[in-house]
Amino acid sequence: MDKKTRRTPEIVIIGAGFGGLAVARGLRRAKANVTLIDRQNHHLFQPLLYQVATAALSPADIAAPIRAIVRRYRNTRVLLDSVVSVDREARLVQLESGTSLPYDALVIATGARHSYFGREDWAVDAPGIKTIDDAIKVRSKILVAMERAETDRQENPVTRSQHLTFIVIGDGPTGVEMAGAIAELTRHAAGLDFRHLSPSCVRVMLVQSDTRLLAAFPLDLAEKAKASLEHLGVEVRLGNRVTNITADSVMIGDERLSAAVIVWAAGVKASPAAAWLGAEADRAGRVIVKPNMSVPGHPDIFVIGDTSSVEGAGGRPVPGVAPAAKQQGQFVARVIRATIRRRRPPRRFKYKDYGNLATIGRKRAVADFGRTKLSGFSAWFVWSTAHLFYLSDFRSRITVGTQWLWSYITFDRGARLITGLGDGMMPTTVWTDDAPKE
């Protein structure tokens, strides 16, 4: 920012995720005009999206309107728009609507997208889960598959088996959590709510080219996670490289695995921020930033969260997780506040690693806090508490906590609604002796 200017500084934040909202919150009392831009009108708690996809939670449980979150931030306005480009020399952000926004400081917190490692054509048949729409579509596909299996029980047993086969690709926390949740949903629903399905008919597979799960965790915890998945009936297939994906199958070498639902959780890449800025990026497309989170040569532009690459302790990159994005947002807000006040800003972001958590299902999780390692119920309790804490508002914490308690007591997943699919995706009704016409 130009320290000679006397007018009110214009701060533009692109992205209302954990990082972007942390910046807005940190600047809520600053003598500046803050503009927060996002393509969606809601802030989404992405770590729990898989629970929407597996009917444990409803979309509104993990999302909140951005305008409601920043309602009390008197210096902040919200724009529902998409960024087209950034003119670094003119200090302008060009929006899809045609609006040009001037800035004195720009914060880019646009997150990450799924990476298919050059096979973007797989995205149609193996969707990842990054948005509410993604989660609803996956949920509906899972539930439709079970309905079809119930309807087709007198037809080809091979086809029926395919309706009850679900494949998750990816060995990180998202893949592990998704596979465990699908297993719990489908097996409990098959046993309780479908007259002609058995839990033993359900097949859930977790496929990954690596030779172990959860690379960020110690090996002993990874093995415990694998054992927990297998206890739920998940087939864990490690060292299996996916060579092709179609609408109803996954190819592993020459082996063809038929499936009704395929979910991608194998990799991410950054948003196009590096292209907007013409900045240096790492292999994942993340903008390489200085220790103070600014872009080299542009002290007025900051990149945070999954969009950035910055060294942490020991020279290792700071992980792309919600706590890191939130801490970076808080740090950048301090830098901007200090600059506005013409004080010396902090020079280096220091990430406080509070550990790694992954849940496998009901009462099953792993937690790595360095010297302290947890698994089983204790890790699951810590995981649940931590995720409730990071939800955006008190209402969401109460709603999610209550739903989890109800599900824990009853095994019931109340959000089993089939929505968002065309009529062509719905099962064809077949009348049988024990299913009378109405």
Predicted regions and their residues:
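Beta1-alpha1 glycine-rich phosphate/pyrophosphate-binding loop at the start
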Residues: D2-R77, V84, F166, P173-F217, ...
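C-terminal, flexible cofactor-proximal segment of oxidoreductases
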Residues: T8, A333-E438
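FAD-site-proximal beta/loop scaffold in flavoenzymes
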Residues: V124-N156, D248-M251, R256-Q327, R334
